[in-house]
Structure formats: structure tokens, C-alpha cells
């Protein structure tokens, strides 16, 4: 298999809003492929199409050699998906969540423990704690363990470290690099450019369009007027009405751009 993911001419609209516009790219087996772009760029929509949760309006996409529409059941068996928001069962314990996801794929924690051991051992002392009571970093490790418990061929991570402290972010990417060494293909979306340094290649997406695909350093050079190498990343404003609160002259904007007048 030359490419484990192939996307050709994919477009998707929600009403009058076009989330994706003629998106094309390919991912090689065993690489970490980064998808970087501001909020609203289309990253989550693209991930939902590739994980068979949303249908594209136009174009074709394949994952693990399978068409995302015709062979969605096979893709769901071969792919692991970690959404941007913590989506596990808050009222179940750590162990119960992992057991539940293993059962969905007709396997057990014991059968695949070796795969998640390095990650799960860090939260195993809290296996009886409810998931809703975990810290951000521990939730992240639990979600990754659940995404891996069925031994997927490819892992989709939608902004997995957003809202997590810097130490936990580094630990998380260290775990991903180790998974890559074991042959797992990883596609990760993030607004953090310093995380993209860990990727083999990245695609820069903005307003639903792929602007460029290359190594992290070359993308930074190509789009230096837009991207900032220091931290959270985008020099262009991306604030919409739902991210701003204005009360009697007091204005607070969330995300990359915070201002109080």
C-alpha cells in the first residue's frame, strides 16, 4: 500500500458555510502527518469524514485502502479516533471506560495490554476513579488508551493537547513518537506549531483549503507572514461572535487573542 490515506477533491458544506473546498492529500504508512490551521479551518470536519462519521458532498477518500462510504465498517475496525473534546463516559471509571471500548471491538484489556501498557500504567493507580474526576492530562491518556485498545492501523487525533498543561503535552507527544516507532500511522490536528515539529510532514489548512504540504520547517518558511513559530501560532485574527463577550464596555476575547478594554 503506497498510501494509507488518500483524499481527492473532498468538499463539504453546512448550509451556506463551505467547511472544506477541494481538499487533496495523501499519507504514507508509518508517518506522523500533521494538520495545522486556525479554529474553523475545517480540521474537525475532515477528521469526521475520514473516520466515517460525516459524508462529504464531493470527492473521494480512502483509509487503509477502503472507501470511507462503501467500506465504513472496515475502516472503523482499523482506525482509532480521539476527538477534540473528551468524549468518554464521565460516570464510568477509568477501567470501565477502557473495558467498554475493548468490548466494542470484541477484545479485552488483557489481550492488548502490551500495546497500551506504557500509557495506561500512568493512570492505572486511578483505575477506579470516575473519568469525569480526572485531570486534563489523565483524561488525555485515558482517551488515547481507549483509541488504541483494538490495535488500529491508523490513529486520528483531533487537537489532542488543547487545554492541557505543557508538561502533559510533551509527555503525550513522546508517547506518539514511540507509537510511530512501532509502525503506527498517526494523523494529528493541532494549532500548536511547536508540536508540528514532531511530524514528518504537515498540511496547512485555512478556510477549508489546503494551502501547502511539506516538512514543518518548509511550511514555516513558506507561510512565515501568517504563522508564528513561537507558540500558538496564527498571526491573523480568527475571532467570531461566539468567542467574544461584551458587557458595558468590557470586552474579553478567547483563544489566541485576549483583550480586555
Where are these regions (language model features)?
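Catalytic Walker B motif of ABC-type/P-loop ATPase nucleotide-binding domains
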Residues: 155-158
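Conserved ABC nucleotide-binding domain
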Residues: 110-132
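Hydrophobic anchor residue at the start of the ABC signature
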Residues: 144
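ABC ATPase "signature
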Residues: 213-214
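Conserved ABC transporter NBD signature motif
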Residues: 59-67, 75
